[in-house]
Amino acid sequence: MMSLSVRPQRRLLSARVSRSQSFAGVLGSHERGPRSFTVFSPPGPPRKPLVLSRVSRMFSVAHPAPKVPQPERLDLVYTALKRGLTAYLEVHQQEQEKLQRQIKESKRNSRLGFLYDLDKQVKSIERFLRRLEFHASKIDELYEAYCVQRRLRDGAYNMVRAYSTGSPGSREARDSLAEATRGHREYTESMCLLENELEAQLGEFHLRMKGLAGFARLCVGDQYEICMKYGRQRWKLRGRIESSGKQVWDSEETVFLPLLTEFLSIKVTELKGLANHVVVGSVSCETKDLFAALPQVVAVDINDLGTIKLSLEVIWSPFDKDDQPSAASTVNKASTVTKRFSTYSQSPPDTPSLREQAFYNMLRRQEELENGTAWSLSSESSDDSSSPQLSGTARHSTPKPLVQQPEPLPVQVAFRRPESLTSGSMDEEPAMTPSLVNGHAPYSRTLSHISEASVDAALTEAVEAVDSQSPIPGPSPLVYPDSTHVERVSSVLPVLNNGHSATSPALSTTGPAPTFIDPAPTTQLDLVHKTTDSAPSELPSITHTTTSSAYSAVSLVNSVPSLTSTTIGSAHTTTPSPLTSTGSVPNATDSTQATPSPTHSTPSPTHTTIRLTHTTVSPTHSSPSPIHTTPSPTHTTVSPTCTTPSSGHSTTSPTQEAKMSTHTTGAVGPVQTTTSPISTTESPSPSTDVAIISSSSAESTGPGTEPLPCSHPASPPYTKADPTASCTSYQSLASSGSKPLTSPAPDSPEQIPKSPSSSPSSSAPEPQHSEHNLAAVAQAPVPEATGGAGDRRLEEALGTLMSALDDYRGQFPELQGLEQEVTRLESLLMQRQGLTRSRASSLSITVEHALESFSFLNDDEDEDNDGPGDRHTSSPEVVAEDRLDSSNGQSLSTGCSALDATLVQHLYHCSRLLLKLGTFGPLRCQEAWALERLLREARVFQEVCERSKLWGNSATSAQEVVQFSASRPGFLTFWDQCTEGLSPFICSVERVLLTFCSQYGARLSLRQPGLAEAVCVKFLEDALGQKLPRRPQPGPGEQFTIFQFWSYVEALDSPSMDAYVTETAEEVLLVQNLNSDDQAVVLKALRLAPEGRLRKDGLRALSSLLVHGNNKVMAAVSTQLRSLSLGPVFRERALLCFLDQLEDGDVQTRVAGCLALGCIKAPEGIEPLVYLCQTDTEAVREAARQSLQQCGEEGQSAHRQLEESLDALPCIFGPSSMASTAF
């Protein structure tokens, strides 16, 4: 049984850090005197505004470049950074729209000085938005370059493994190995440099100390020392509690530079004397969630109980201190603008100031140059136009009597419009028809030109003279350039969306031209050559920022050309082409990626090209029968339309080599003909040869999607013969009478594995290859050996598990035994094949297959040269050659196909269980359950290794394979009946069900019809650790191994098979009665339910009655749970079950678990309940709060602390956004 004391050691990425957003400890007036912690500010006069010169930057040495790249961590930080930049853009766009609305609303009764200030802020925000978009595009380019280097490094790693297999070989082989090793090292260094470059673009974290908060913990006169460590950056501060309840700290503010791989360590020490210092607590906090546009008030639990909290205000700036834009604080100027607005709107216009007089003179000169007429300064003529200038219609109409004011004194302006540009604009004006707003043409100059004699203003002025089109009101970053603007627009800033980004084809720079990643494959290939040939010289140039004169003239709103339209350097310009796909097989998030179209200005979902891999293997269209199989040498399937492959087709085995044909949406599907029992499908559709390599980063799930929880494996996409007939017989399943699998919805990203040829996307981070294999295993079905000489599924499954265990080494001590047994199994298999130990774990990777890791370079070039329909079909000779190569190489095998299939199933099961490890937060029952199952699998591999000398012998009974530690009559006999006439190693679930019903159906049907089937299903689900489908699924069914049967029976308390069947039948009947719609049946079952019969399913049924039952039933369930929880055995069993329910995917199940924990008054559930109160949905939060109040004094204290902390925080930091705003 699993014990609650088992707390596995955590790795650093998932260190136990409470993500509590609470600011608990804000004491009320009734707690320990009149102390008030509502404001944490030192006594005396209020603080001055933030001055950057006063802020201490706690870093003297730059963070060193990493030695080993960490792509997984970079993916997480990049995703959080993009989310923060997008939020920054949205906030400033909203502020800009607000100011523009304010300008329109305040034109009639306001003086021009107020409009001047508003328009100045609008222009400042526009410049900041352009700079922010350029910064985001630079980050996208760095990340795309990093993805290319990562794929090249994975390919070089495959080459090294390929050359390292077997003996050293010839001198040429050794030289090739040295070259591949050198390339791997160079790619690694390039990745490290790119990580360092990207780290330099993360901006700054401005931290402000808010104070300590504690529930009955802080006293007057207490002194504390807080030490924060962030990489090489330090911040140490001391503070004391004053008698007034305020806290005084010697340092209040600091600036931290964000780091990619480091965590913020906080240590709080209470100073009590000269040497008596007490460490209150020390925690490590995640910082990737601090990339947010708005200031965040975060609270960190310093100790385990959460009685001491550190409150910090964190402000993230996307730019460094030395590179701060002038408009970074424009969002905070709304109060000043509102004050001016209220002042100016109460009185008539006053005498113009000198600045306004200069503005009037400039407008008068402009008017005289254009038509020689004068314009009035009267408020009656301003109306609601955007400038005092009258439209052409108004000028030619009958003049009205206007009140003329005396001409102000001439005042020299800081700069004037050049004569040439002015004349040019006058020449172009008659050819254009400006849009009219309330009968007036908007004036081309802005009010901000009066006081801003900068290069930025001059460039904008020149741009407006060249192209005097009417600006689009309001910022609109989601605009693509049309075909007429491609040639004359120097740069198009990227489109920022949630998870989608498009880099600019060319960017104007004044320095060396940086290398950019372009969506077109040719530019990607160009980047690869540049980064590999001159990495030290080219990589730093990627981060060169342009001066304000270069990028400030780029107008995303107006799409106007700038003065720097000619790119200095070797930057290339690519015309966007419609319907351009960036890869043969898109990632999970690539299916919604839109490409620029020359005829549209906005991205449209209908212009998205989704290329799906339609892999069809004929043996999957079969209904396997363990008794009768019919060989089918040929099988033809005609697909009328190109549909998304189902899970049984799309997930390719790590060792299956299938030729995949790509189709565009709506294309007619090909005719697929299989001419061999070995499932290799030939397709006349245009395709490229893609080989799936298990150790490369080819197969992956989308980063935005979680891997499948592995409730049950999907159908295998390859031939699944029944190896239990004989250890040396190889038969193919009959395909006659099968039905084609229906394709699921196209929005199922988990079912589309990523091809090695897909280009890296800036919006889709790629996990590392070890996580790729695990995620692919979670989706892939458990394969079963066909017994061929070229069958490499065993070694591929072994290599996948070994790679996964490498990632978890040292993090979970429980996995040490499993790793030893898997390594022992690999050694025994190698010895059987006569291989040396120096050979790598994945022996199937040859040099030819390793070279295909670089196939994405050629594929991208082919995509750029040929259209979607110009691909050449792969020849049948190539297909046959690949199949021949795969069958000629040596493969690991025990000599018995059934045992091979059994080992493959257990290896993949271990890989799926590893996905459940490393969870964050206090909900760890699934993790503990997975560790327990992994310990069982270690015993299985130990048993297999101990009987390695008997691998070649054909076992005929279960007695020859396994032995129980205690006498358990009936179990092995039952297994022999299930595998009668077959191998005893593996059996189908359907056969076990038929055997069980035939043996126990007559006896159990006397009590209730269908009870035997329900008992057997429960037995199989408990043994397999997953739910079985209630309806028959197409394709081969689930398999059940003798070792799964043996390890499950070993953990049972039942002495015999008959006793187990009787106990399980009683439990099944109890669960059915508890789930009955008849209230009398439910109450009777509750009254007669014995303590020993209430196990997991019964406890779940009881907890569900707390949600779905009426008041009488709920009261009876509560009473029953309280009385039964007095027993220690039942209480531990119930506690584990209800805690496990808190991690269920169903909301009602989590609500039931919360209410049940409150009924048994479990203090062990306080921490998980508090976590749910902060992170889950409203229904679960309400149930968790109700349960906390029932968990005694400690639970009520936690509930009060939670409520106070939530009330003290702003509404934007409520429970619904906890995960994104807390540490």
Curated annotation (Swiss-Prot):
Query: Where is this gene product found?
Result: Cytoplasm; Golgi apparatus
Report the residues modified as Phosphoserine: 22, 345, 347, 451, 454, 468, 748, 874-875
UniProt lists compositionally biased (Polar residues) regions at 656-665, 693-703, 725-741
Q: Where is the composition biased (Acidic residues)?
A: 858-867
User: Which intervals of the chain are annotated as region Disordered?
Assistant: 371-411, 566-771, 856-887
**One GO cellular component term:** membrane
Tissue localization of expression is:
Expressed in the kidney exclusively by glomerular podocytes.
Spell out which residues are annotated as carrying Phosphothreonine. 351
UniProt entry tagged with the keyword Transcription regulation: no
Q: Mind listing the GO biological process terms from this record?
A: cellular response to starvation; establishment of Golgi localization; positive regulation of cell migration; positive regulation of intracellular protein transport; protein localization to Golgi apparatus; response to wounding; Rho protein signal transduction
Record function comment: Downstream effector protein for Rho-type small GTPases that plays a role in cell polarity and directional migration. Acts as an adapter protein, linking active Rho proteins to STK24 and STK26 kinases, and hence positively regulates Golgi reorientation in polarized cell migration upon Rho activation. Involved in the subcellular relocation of STK26 from the Golgi to cytoplasm punctae in a Rho- and PDCD10-dependent manner upon serum stimulation.
Subunit (UniProt): Interacts (via N-terminus) with RHOA (GTP-bound form); this interaction links active RHOA to STK24 and STK26 kinases. Interacts with RHOB. Interacts with RHOC. Interacts (via C-terminus) with PDCD10; this interaction occurs in a Rho-independent manner. Interacts (via C-terminus) with STK24; this interaction occurs in a PDCD10-dependent and Rho-independent manner. Interacts (via C-terminus) with STK26; this interaction occurs in a PDCD10-dependent and Rho-independent manner. Interacts (via N-terminus) with 14-3-3 proteins; these interactions occur in a Rho-dependent manner.
Query: What is the name listed in the Swiss-Prot or TrEMBL entry for this protein?
Result: Rho family-interacting cell polarization regulator 1
Q: Tell me the organism.
A: Mus musculus (Mouse)
